[in-house]
């Protein structure tokens, strides 16, 4: 129970800041928070409320003589300091007399200081937003406007918190619901209102990392038989703790993701794409939760999960390492049994100290470098000699293959489909209808450790939960609050129609083709490791940055697509990359929206590169993915000047690897030409259409040594002056000389958009 009280107390340790900002009370936030929580009978627990009342040095000094030396508030105190990257001697409390706190200051953007050496520092902030279950968080982008948060905003939060906290208890079954409340209500509440500092860390991010650190310290002390928390964490010799490797930074890294999603064929390949992507997302979420369960930790200890990766903060104990070793063995056995070598999850960890997490020794970046090296080593030596021998003896010659994924094992009797593909096809029908997913002893999709997953209605899930305590429930993009109820998972899963044939049937004009977009954030790894200046690098800030990226791809993406009902299905949206299929015109149009909104969201501190392919509906999915991936790679290699040494990226490739353009060229050159062409060519008959094809042929033949084609071009344009006007004919001629490549692209898009179906 001590650990539960510590986690809940650490999560709620700064709740008094909301009370302070939303009322006229003049007391310190620690006192206000303690009084507020004690107004709920179920939270009247001294160990818990002390973590709220006494997490600053001044308050601790005044009561330590009357408190036990193993009081939990000492752990919350130091975890609070580590989370904020703050030296314990600079321990200021919001609401204290003599300091100039600005109650109305808005949450700043973490992108303000990102890559500031190259792109400068900004002063953007967020408008106030609180997300509830029934109201989806609106698109909330940082603005240069000096936003202010009024007392009324905070008063509204207090009302919402009272309603939710009445339904919660400080126990294991309610911790995740408490976290979800905090994420919904506190994501845009600044942790600090000190305008002399950066105010870009939300109260939610600071509080959850504080709880993660606190629970890890608790486990470390239990293993080391340390019982005098006052001496270890508060008295003068407490500085020694900051150098102890009390923590483990641990990660999961899934390999084979793209091949698993895309390397399928068969009549139902397109329909099962989303199911395969969703399955991998859920695998990583469930694996992370299962490990936390074994370690007796909460989801606060998940620093990031998404895109085939997860990062967790754990205690550096022999018990933790033993659990990790057993877990890794069991996990690998399951993946080998179900997927052979097609999918693999690497697990690695590295020991870290509080000073590492605070970057006081300049070693914070080294945590991720060491972790990356250990993960790479695991991937390079993923199987033992015995496992490889077993794999080599499992194959059978002339075996029937699965009609979808071409596997020759796990086939269902009397059917040419394997168990996994069959299950994915069954669940794919429910993915767009249901938002609740249950992991239990019985179900449809195989999950690790003897469990199965099913998509159910709310009433079905609720009934199952009441009858079986072992059931684990996840909700997709919906928050639920209650006892051991549901874990919210945000997913970029916008679906216009599950049937692509029906989707294309709705397009009345233009070539009947699917468009495929693959996009990736440029240099994201570099930004994560080196983008935040040393003075501001901390575990809370990197957690904030990671969550911001997830919010864009897993939450805002859905809203951007739904605003104009784009005929597009999101197949995969990770923490930094994207794969979508839809009507090709909608894919092309939305690509500009994606680029613009991502630039707005990151304040032009980050960019995105993309490849856009066009294919017939029956074209093999694996080839669609591969060829569009090649187009994306071409965009990543974009150089505005051939003499440039380094690629600038921030580009898009259209249909063919030779058609690589900067986003600015596509938006402000090609699309401008396309609009002019559409306006002037819209009344052309079939003879006029032939003129366009002739024009493209001539343009493709023009180069520095072919003046004859320039003459032919001028002659062809002169013959069309009567139909398109002399002015536009001259403009086409000028474009042909100055911007031939973009003119060809604009003409080709026009033909594709107006071609008979």
Regions found by a protein language model. Name each.
Residues 1-137, 142, 189-193, 242-243, ...:
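Divalent metal-dependent catalytic cores for phosphoryl transfer on phosphate-bearing substrates
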Residues 1-5, 30-43, 201-237, 467-469, ...:
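Alpha-helical phosphate/pyrophosphate-handling elements in metalloenzyme active cores
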Residues 48-55, 248, 300-313, 340-358, ...:
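A short glycine-enriched loop-to-beta-strand structural element that forms part of the catalytic core
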Residues 211-222, 278-297, 325-335, 547-567, ...:
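Alpha-helical scaffold within the catalytic cores of cyclic-nucleotide enzymes
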Residues 315, 326, 330, 349, ...:
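Cyclic nucleotide signaling catalytic output domains
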Residues 334-345, 370-385, 601-605, 627-659:
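Catalytic/regulatory signature loops of cyclic-dinucleotide turnover enzymes
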Residues 379-463, 479:
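Cys/His-rich short segments
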Residues 641-757:
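Long, compositionally biased charged/polar accessory segments in the mid-to-C-terminal portions
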């Amino acid at each position: 129970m001590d650990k539960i009280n510590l986690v809940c107390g650490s999560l709620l340790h700064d709740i008094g800041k909301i009370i302070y900002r939303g009322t006229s009370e003049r007391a310190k936030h620690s006192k206000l928070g303690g009084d507020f929580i004690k107004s709920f009978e179920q939270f009247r627990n001294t160990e818990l409320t002390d973590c709220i009342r006494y997490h600053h040095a001044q308050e601790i000094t005044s009561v330590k003589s009357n408190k036990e030396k193993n009081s939990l508030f000492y752990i919350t105190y130091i975890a609070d300091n580590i989370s904020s990257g703050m030296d314990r001697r600079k321990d200021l409390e919001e609401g204290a007399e003599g300091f100039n706190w600005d109650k109305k200051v808005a949450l700043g953007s973490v992108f303000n200081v990102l890559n500031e050496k190259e792109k400068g520092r900004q002063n953007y902030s967020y408008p106030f937003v609180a997300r509830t279950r029934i109201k989806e968080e609106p698109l909330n982008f940082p603005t240069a406007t000096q936003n202010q948060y009024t007392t009324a905003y905070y008063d509204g939060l207090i009302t919402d918190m009272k309603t939710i906290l009445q339904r919660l208890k400080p126990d294991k079954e309610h911790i995740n619901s408490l976290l979800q409340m905090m994420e919904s209500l506190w994501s845009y509440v600044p942790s600090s209102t000190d305008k002399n500092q950066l105010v870009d860390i939300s109260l939610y991010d600071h509080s959850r990392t504080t709880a993660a650190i606190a629970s890890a310290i608790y486990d470390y002390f239990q293993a080391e038989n340390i019982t005098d928390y006052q001496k270890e964490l508060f008295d003068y010799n407490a500085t020694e703790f900051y150098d102890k490797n009390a923590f483990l930074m641990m990660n999961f890294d899934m390999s084979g993701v793209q091949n698993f999603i895309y390397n399928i064929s068969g009549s139902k390949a397109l329909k099962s794409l989303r199911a395969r992507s969703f399955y991998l997302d859920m695998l990583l979420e469930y694996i992370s939760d299962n490990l936390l369960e074994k370690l007796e930790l909460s989801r606060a200890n998940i620093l990031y999960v998404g895109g085939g990766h997860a990062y967790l903060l754990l205690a550096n104990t022999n018990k933790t390492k033993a659990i990790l070793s057993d877990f890794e063995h069991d996990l690998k056995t399951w993946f080998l049994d179900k997927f052979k070598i097609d999918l693999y999850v690497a697990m690695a960890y590295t020991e870290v100290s509080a000073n590492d997490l605070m970057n006081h020794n300049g070693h914070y970046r080294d945590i991720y470098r060491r972790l990356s090296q250990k993960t790479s080593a695991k991937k390079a030596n993923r199987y033992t000699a015995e496992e490889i021998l077993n794999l080599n003896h499992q194959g059978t010659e002339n075996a029937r293959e699965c009609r979808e994924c071409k596997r020759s094992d796990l086939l269902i009797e009397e059917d040419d489909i394997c168990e996994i593909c069959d299950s994915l096809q069954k669940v794919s029908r429910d993915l767009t209808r249901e938002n609740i997913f249950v992991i239990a002893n019985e179900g449809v999709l195989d999950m690790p450790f003897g469990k199965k997953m099913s998509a159910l209605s709310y009433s079905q899930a609720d009934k199952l939960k009441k009858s079986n305590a072992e059931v684990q429930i996840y909700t997709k993009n919906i928050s639920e609050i209650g006892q051991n109820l549901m874990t919210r998972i945000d997913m970029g899963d916008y679906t216009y129609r599950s049937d692509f044939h029906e989707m294309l049937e709705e397009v009345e004009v233009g070539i009947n083709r699917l468009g495929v977009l693959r996009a990736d954030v440029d240099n994201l790894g570099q930004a994560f490791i080196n983008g935040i200046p040393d003075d501001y690098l901390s575990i809370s800030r990197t957690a904030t940055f990671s969550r911001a990226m997830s919010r864009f791809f897993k939450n805002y993406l859905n809203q951007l697509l739904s605003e104009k009902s784009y005929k597009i299905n999101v197949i995969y949206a990770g923490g930094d990359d994207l794969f979508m299929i839809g009507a090709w015109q909608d894919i092309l149009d939305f690509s500009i929206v994606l680029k613009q909104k991502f630039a707005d969201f990151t304040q032009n501190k980050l960019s995105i590169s993309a490849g856009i392919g066009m294919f017939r509906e029956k074209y093999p999915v694996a080839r669609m993915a591969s060829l569009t991936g090649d187009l994306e790679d071409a965009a990543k290699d974009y150089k505005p000047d051939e003499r440039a040494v380094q690629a600038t990226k921030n580009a898009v490739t259209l249909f063919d690897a030779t058609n690589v353009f900067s986003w600015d060229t596509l938006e402000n050159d090609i699309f401008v030409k396309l609009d002019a062409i559409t306006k002037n060519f819209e009344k052309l008959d079939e003879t006029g259409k032939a003129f366009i094809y002739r024009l493209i042929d001539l343009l493709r033949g023009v180069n520095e040594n072919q003046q004859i084609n320039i003459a032919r071009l001028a002659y062809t344009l002169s013959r069309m002056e009567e139909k398109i006007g002399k002015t536009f004919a001259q403009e086409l001629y000028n474009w042909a000389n100055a911007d031939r490549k973009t003119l060809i692209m604009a003409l080709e898009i026009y033909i594709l958009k107006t071609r008979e179906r």
